Design a protein with these regions (language model features):
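N-terminal ligand-binding/catalytic initiation module
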Residues: 1-109, 117, 124-127, 261, ...
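Generic secondary-structure signature for well-ordered alpha-helical cores
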Residues: 18, 28-37, 121-125, 149-152, ...
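Glycine-rich adenosine-cofactor-binding loop
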Residues: 116, 127-148, 161-166
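Short helix-loop-beta connector
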Residues: 123-130, 154, 217-218
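A structural signal for isolated positions on well-ordered beta-strands in alpha/beta enzyme cores
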Residues: 132, 157-159, 183
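NAD(P)-binding Rossmann-fold cofactor-contacting core
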Residues: 150-174
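Rossmann-like adenosine-cofactor binding region
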Residues: 179-255
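Adenosine-phosphate binding glycine-rich loop
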Residues: 229, 233-320
Length: 320
């Protein structure tokens, strides 16, 4: 028995010209189905040193006659370029057939940025139009693209924490959005103290980024994209939301959160989310396979044909 397996490369994904606002819609649509998925915990192996290879499986519910299962394999290996890479294997869950092998790097970045943008939009206090962003590499820019595209109908401001030339490069990347204004802040304490929504895409934080709790004013929403550097907030913020309890429950201060719930319950209307403009809210989104597989399935449906190979499988019982 032979069936065709699509190989979806980065160049094919680029050719789709997917709007970042579409990515925000996709992560919301995926969150809304979270109660109906099967998503076992991530499983990691460590070949050497700090390197890792992690598997992230997820079974999506049936929709319009299709039922997808996928597994994302993500690796961080010292010396590979880029250091962090991922591939997604997408299956037809009804037949068990492998449908596609999808480059996962773009998906990882954009679903991460889209989740942060959706969390900001959902949990920010009323009337906010200013977003303070630090860690302005690829993921930080993905956050900016999603926020800018999702707020096309109004003017917003990005306050950028200066570090090397990252802020200037961020501005250059997003300069074509006519609804976005930019401010570059040099003082770290002022950056935090004046933030209404603080989004950190800092990838490495071996200590607290803002150990002075008084810097976080009432009504602030903090979104640590890589869940690092804000553990002090765990102890005094009014509410904490996470993308998946199985991941967040291992945090050091999980049992000391004042109030905790999964973020998708806010989107479903089961939790009010922000109740007033004084609450300090923390949003932890560790990254879940649900979004990777949802994105891969939508991209597969748009491409399907193209590069690939015929996979020959035994169609009779194998006897030994």
């Amino acid at each position: 028995m032979t069936h065709y397996v699509s190989v979806i490369q980065q160049s094919q994904i680029d050719a789709l010209h997917l709007n970042p606002a579409t990515c925000v819609e996709w992560v919301k649509e995926a969150f809304l189905m979270k109660d109906d998925i099967q998503m076992p915990a991530k499983l990691s192996v460590h070949p050497q040193g700090e390197d890792f290879i992690t598997s992230m499986p997820c079974l999506l519910p049936e929709s319009q006659g299709r039922k997808y299962f996928g597994i994302k394999m993500v690796s961080r290996i010292d010396g590979q370029v880029p250091t962090l890479q991922s591939n997604i294997f997408l299956y037809d869950a009804k037949s068990g057939h492998l449908l596609a092998v999808v480059d996962g790097d773009w998906i990882t970045a954009m679903r991460t940025g889209a989740v942060a943008a959706l969390a900001a939009k959902t949990l920010q206090r009323k009337g906010n139009s200013t977003y303070s962003i630090m860690g302005l590499g690829n993921i930080g820019r993905a956050v900016g693209l999603c926020l800018a595209a999702d707020n096309r109908d109004r003017q917003i401001t990005f306050r950028l924490l200066h570090y090397k030339d990252q802020a200037e490069r961020f501005v250059e990347r997003l300069k074509d959005f006519d609804n976005v204004n930019f401010e570059i802040v040099n003082d770290k304490r002022i950056f935090a103290a004046d933030a209404d929504v603080l989004i950190s895409a800092v990838t490495v934080a071996t200590e607290l980024l803002f150990p002075d709790d008084s810097l976080f004013r009432e009504g602030v929403t903090v979104i640590p994209v890589h869940v690092r550097g804000f553990q002090n907030c765990d102890l005094f913020f009014d509410k904490v939301f996470g993308d998946d309890t199985g991941q967040v429950s291992g945090f050091k201060y999980f049992n000391q959160f004042r109030q905790y719930d999964e973020f998708h319950h806010v989107l479903q209307g089961k939790n009010p989310g922000r109740a007033n403009d004084e609450e300090r809210i923390l949003s932890y989104n560790y990254g879940i396979a649900l979004h990777d597989i949802f994105f891969a399935s939508r991209i597969y449906e748009r491409i399907q044909t193209g590069d690939g190979f015929n996979l020959e499988k035994q169609d009779k019982k194998l006897w030994f």
